[in-house]
Amino acid sequence: MAPAADREGYWGPTTSTLDWCEENYSVTWYIAEFWNTVSNLIMIIPPMFGAVQSVRDGLEKRYIASYLALTVVGMGSWCFHMTLKYEMQLLDELPMIYSCCIFVYCMFECFKIKNSVNYHLLFTLVLFSLIVTTVYLKVKEPIFHQVMYGMLVFTLVLRSIYIVTWVYPWLRGLGYTSLGIFLLGFLFWNIDNIFCESLRNFRKKVPPIIGITTQFHAWWHILTGLGSYLHILFSLYTRTLYLRYRPKVKFLFGIWPVILFEPLRKH
């Protein structure tokens, strides 16, 4: 976490329960944590295109919701790091729980008939979200949120490992790439927290262009945003493969991964 001696800017005093290692208002008076803010674009723009593509392809609404949920997380995180206000912190952290619940639902419903609804699982996840929200609003303890979020991510990891081990082994590349990128982001998140003072001292001694590369919370956004996006692709690939849609991972402009569907063969 950041040392206490940070300047104020356009949004006034910090009211959030967390303040990250990036120096506040060091780039512009209007954005508290500039790099932590703009790094959220990876969680906003690509998932929006994914949602539009899912609508065009006539995919199940749960996957449209997955893309949109990731976009909401990115927008909430943008608002939080831009302002460092408690209300905006909630707009970041609570959607992280809700989006993961959507991901969990999708992963555990991959092998059901099309457009089926598991009301028991749906009720359980909604109840879990309500309990976490209620408790977190009362205790205001970030560690509680982090543990609850970690539980959901761990559930997704176990389910993904099951799928690539026992169901579709040829999806290991996509599944493990998603997991590896996410874990690398988690490593950077910890480095940013544990070595914050050392990182700040280092930035004072090097050119700004080098200092930018040590904004590890921004890297956390980039890597977990990409990892989450790839997880949606993995979940969607698994689901549509089960439904015999003939999915294929293609790279838009040779860079960005998307899922396209080959036409069904006519006999």
UniProtKB/Swiss-Prot annotation:
Mutation effect (N24G): Strongly decreased enzyme activity
Outcome (variant: D19G): Mildly decreased enzyme activity
Annotated Zn(2+) binding sites: H81, H217, H221
Major subcellular location class: endoplasmic reticulum
Effect of S99A: No effect on enzyme activity
Lumenal side: 56-61, 109-118, 163-173, 237-267
Binding residues annotated for Ca(2+), in chain numbering: D19, W20, E22, N24, E33
Side Cytoplasmic, residues: 1-33, 83-87, 140-141, 195-215
Location of this chain's protein in the cell: Endoplasmic reticulum membrane; Golgi apparatus membrane
Membrane topology according to the record: Multi-pass membrane protein
Substrates-to-products reaction catalysed: an N-acyl-(4R)-4-hydroxysphinganine + H2O = (4R)-hydroxysphinganine + a fatty acid; N-(5Z,8Z,11Z,14Z-eicosatetraenoyl)-sphing-4-enine + H2O = sphing-4-enine + (5Z,8Z,11Z,14Z)-eicosatetraenoate; N-(5Z,8Z,11Z,14Z-eicosatetraenoyl)-sphinganine + H2O = sphinganine + (5Z,8Z,11Z,14Z)-eicosatetraenoate; N-(5Z,8Z,11Z,14Z-eicosatetraenoyl)-(4R)-hydroxysphinganine + H2O = (4R)-hydroxysphinganine + (5Z,8Z,11Z,14Z)-eicosatetraenoate
Record-annotated membrane-spanning stretches: 34-55, 62-82, 88-108, 119-139, 142-162, 174-194, 216-236
Enzyme class, spelled out: hydrolase
Keywords from the named record: Calcium, Disease variant, Endoplasmic reticulum, Golgi apparatus, Hydrolase, Leukodystrophy, Lipid metabolism, Membrane, Metal-binding, Sphingolipid metabolism, Transmembrane, Transmembrane helix, Zinc
Pathway: Lipid metabolism; sphingolipid metabolism
One cellular-component annotation, GO: membrane
Outcome of substituting S228A: No effect on enzyme activity
UniProt note: pH dependence: Optimum pH is 9.5.
Regulation: Activated by 5 mM Ca(2+) and inhibited by 5 mM Zn(2+).
Enzyme Commission designation: 3.5.1.-, 3.5.1.23
UniProt disease annotation: Leukodystrophy, progressive, early childhood-onset: A form of leukodystrophy, a disorder of myelin production or maintenance affecting the central nervous system. PELCO features include neurological regression between 6 and 13 months of age, truncal hypotonia, appendicular spasticity, dystonia, optic disk pallor, peripheral neuropathy and neurogenic bladder. Brain imaging shows progressive diffuse abnormal white matter signals, cerebral atrophy, and thin corpus callosum. Sural nerve biopsy shows decreased myelination. PLDECO inheritance is autosomal recessive.
Membership in a protein family: Belongs to the alkaline ceramidase family.
Functional description taken from the UniProt entry: Endoplasmic reticulum and Golgi ceramidase that catalyzes the hydrolysis of unsaturated long-chain C18:1-, C20:1- and C20:4-ceramides, dihydroceramides and phytoceramides into sphingoid bases like sphingosine and free fatty acids at alkaline pH. Ceramides, sphingosine, and its phosphorylated form sphingosine-1-phosphate are bioactive lipids that mediate cellular signaling pathways regulating several biological processes including cell proliferation, apoptosis and differentiation. Controls the generation of sphingosine in erythrocytes, and thereby sphingosine-1-phosphate in plasma.
Name recorded for this polypeptide: Alkaline ceramidase 3
Organism of origin: Homo sapiens
